Every structure is written in C-alpha cells, then in structure tokens.
Amino acid sequence: MTARELVCSQRVGQGLSRRLRPLVLAVTLGVLVVTLSGCSWSDALAIGWPEGITPEAHLNRQLWIGAVVASLVVGVIVWGLIFWSTIFHRKKTTDTELPRQFGYNMPLELVLTVTPFLIISMLFYFTVIVQDKMLYLAKDPEVVIDVTAFQWNWKFGYQRVDFKDGTLTYDGVDPARKKAMVSKPEGKDSHGEELVGAVRGLNTEDRAYLNFDKVETLGTTTEIPVLVLPAGKRIEFQLNSADVVHSFWVPKFLFKRDVMPNPVANNSVNVFQVEEITKTGAFVGHCAEMCGTYHSMMNFEVRVVAPNDFKAYLQQRIDGKTNAEALQVIAQPPLAVTTHPFDTRRGQLTNSQ
C-alpha cells in the first residue's frame, strides 16, 4: 500500500467513525430512555397504542407491534444498505472504471421480488386472523346495548340481558316508542293515490330504524352519558345515528365503527361485539367522525363493573332510579370521571369580561 493510499484509508476510517458516532449515541440514549422510564419494550414498540381491555384489543395490539417490528427490520436493512453503499462505495479519485453493475442479475431480482411478497403475505395472513376475531358475531351475546348517536351526544339503552349462569334475564325493548317513530303518511295526490316519500317511500322525518328501550341513559349539555357494563360478559353493540354519520370509539377497545343513519338502507354493518371486558374501571369514549360544530365535545364514558354490581345497577334503573342514583347505590361515582361536559357559557363569559 502506498503512502497516499494509506492516508486515504485512514481518512475513510475517521470519516466512518464520525458518521457512526451519532448513530451509536442515539441508540444508547434510546435504550437508556426506555430502561430508566420503566417502560417495557412492548410499550415502546406499541408507539402510543394503549393497553386494551378486551381480548380483541389485545390481539389488535399484538398485530400492530408485529407490523412495527417488521417495518423496523426492513427499514434497518434498507438504511444499512444505503449507508454501506454511501460510505464504502463512493467514487474515489483513483477510480477509472464503472463499478460492477447488477442489472439483469436474475437471482438477485428474484430475491428482491419474492421477499416483499412473503412479507406482505405474512402481514395479510395475521391481519385476516385478527380481523375475523374482531368482527365475529356470536348468536347469544349476554348483553345487547342500543347505541344512538345524534348531534352532539349519545343515548344508550339496554335492549336485552341474558347471563349464561341464569342469574339475570331482562328484555328491555320498548315497542310503543319505536312504533311512534314510524313514518307518517305523506298524504294523497289529486287522483286519491297515497304519495310516496323521498326516502325509500318514507318521509324525511322517518326514524323507525332507531331502537328504543325501557332503560336508557341520555347525554345532555350538562351531563356526560355513562354507559355501565359488566366485566367478563360478551357484549353486543347495535349502532344507529339519528342524523349524520358519527363513529363509536372507545380507545381502550382499540376498535371503532361508524354510526350510520338507517344502516340497513345504507348497506352498512352497524353491529359489533366484544368477547368480554377484562378490566373494571372508567374508560372514555369519543365520536371519531367529524359531525359538525361540537364534534370534539361528543364524548361519553364506559363504566365497567363486576357482574353482581351490574345486576344491582340494572335493578335500580328498572325501579326508576336515574343513572347517577343507580351508580351511587353500587358505590360508583355518579357522574363521568374521565371527561367533562362542554361549557356552553364560555363565549358568554369571555364577552362579559
């Protein structure tokens, strides 16, 4: 090796060291941050996804973490090849020929074609498994909840409760109120024939698709609706909107579903189930579809309690107690604790100052 080549080699080594030093420092700091913060690698790889409270949510989170790991592996390989080529295969002043070309290299092209296909196939396979689990509908859910969204609040009703252990059976459908929502006749034309409405033969005020129950919780301007659910039971949610498109989203479910007006007529799926809720407590819910002026304030709370407490709560509601009163009977906070109502006086207060 000549003196000039030796000097060039030393410079390349020093340049490589300078380039790798920030990368090594960043990796070291990342490891220290995760370790000292008490976070697990699972939390770090979840990148903000919360711990779920249903079996479906746990599967969805694992799928997400798997996709993140796969992306990081592919990214590291690609970045490594880019940096390797940039550092070790730069054109040197002594180069007089073109570097080796890889065009029409059949084995390499096959590898670069098959590898992405295998990665995508694996992700697709696990996605289908998790999706089937999340969308599965059992024929005999133990609790059926009617969810009605409207601008800009929620109504929750207990349509049916049938615990498999036989300790609680309840049919809460209110057919009289539902019948009252049937479309009124449009009248008759000059020939005495009944007029046909604009919406599938019905008038625009028809709300016969909505469900009504004897025990309901209605959100208001001053009170966040609290949906009380039992832990450890399969629960079905039937979603309907009274006006525009909304979206039912409980972040801890790691799942959301759009709430459509007249879902049958719109060919939309408005039902989903959770196998069980594995943790008691209070969990915030939101509307996740832009639905107008106060969309961001359209919140609710899911309050998960033990099955015996749920039975006592439902009995109190059947006996005529309000939602807050029934919650107090089972030693629960009477109002929402994860969110609060939107203060509609804020503009008035600002103008008065």
From Swiss-Prot:
Record GO biological process: ATP synthesis coupled electron transport
Location of this chain's protein in the cell: Cell membrane
A Pfam family recorded for this sequence: COX2
A GO cellular-component term linked to this record: plasma membrane
Bilayer topology: Multi-pass membrane protein
PROSITE patterns hit by this protein: COX2, COX2_CUA
Binding site for Cu cation: H246, C287, C291, H295
GO terms, molecular function: copper ion binding; cytochrome-c oxidase activity
Translocase keyword on record: yes
Known catalytic reactions: 4 Fe(II)-[cytochrome c] + O2 + 8 H(+)(in) = 4 Fe(III)-[cytochrome c] + 2 H2O + 4 H(+)(out)
General function of this protein: Subunits I and II form the functional core of the enzyme complex. Electrons originating in cytochrome c are transferred via heme a and Cu(A) to the binuclear center formed by heme a3 and Cu(B).
Protein name per Swiss-Prot or TrEMBL: Probable cytochrome c oxidase subunit 2
Organism: Mycobacterium leprae (strain TN)
Gene (UniProt): ctaC
